[in-house]
Amino acid sequence: MKKETKVQLIIIVILSIILGILVFTLFKENNNRNNMFAPMEEEVEKETSKDDVDNGDTINEENINLNNYESNINITKGGEYNISGSFNYSLIVNSTEKVILNLNNVSINSEITASIANINTGELVINIPKGTTSTLKDKGSSEYDGCIYSSGKLTIQGDGKLYVYGNQEEGEGIATTDNDITINGGEIYIESADDGLNAGGDNGGTITINDGNIYIKASGDGIDSNKNLIINGGKVYTMGSSIGGDAGIDTDGSFEINGGEVIALGSDMLQSPDKSSKQKYVSFTLTTKISKNSNISLKDSKDNEIISFTADEDLKTLVISNSKLSTGTYYIYVDGEKTEYSKAID
């Protein structure tokens, strides 16, 4: 091969390599430019549907040990069920008949919806036997937006302890839709991302508290009824959000205190009991907030203490009622110091 031919061949090879590099570079830049202006895929959290909740095992045995199951449990027949053990799913009640659940040291930590959901029209009764402690937690996002949720009437009773943590997005602690909630007993502790105890829906439901020790710490309203609230007994401590726009108690209808002990605290909204209430009460809207962890006392004009408690959050509204209140003037003390706030009862 002649020397000139070799040189020409080398030049052709070099030019081919350069041309290839240029073509690859232009293609890559054009592809990047197209990707730059392509719409980004948004990660959307899927709301749990009824079909998702219905998936699982249908169990209608009298004794149910949650440790034996790795999916939701569906109860479809009326009757009384003894529940024990723990799992990370949901206990679904789907019956038109009355269902009673006896919680015997149960632990439910649901990943996608309510820990206990009654999705049909039958009444749900949750019994907390004496000497037991049960804990319910939920998270995710679903139409069953209470850690305990019921489409039918809901009754909670017993002498045991029940801890409820409503962690769903905008989730309630205990909730119904267009139906009543009745609490007849138990030591019940509720924390929630929204309302603690909620009877919602277009028609609402009446919340009735006859007995029990109830503690509520909510990021929304402590107790919210789209209908009525009646407190006949027990001890109720309810704290609404400290951020603003929420109350210890909020109802669309009547609000009666006929007995028991009630402490309802909030950030700015205040709803006082109806005058038809059979038990005396005092309510305050303060001009300056009382700080979290302050010790608060209510005393009469003779310096007798009526009630005392610790504020779990900053607050500016208070409703207080117990059997010691009668005609007279009452004063708020904070950390042992008498404040400017007083209220007279006729």
Regions found by a protein language model. Give the residues of each.
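A composition-driven surface/loop motif
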Residues: 3-346
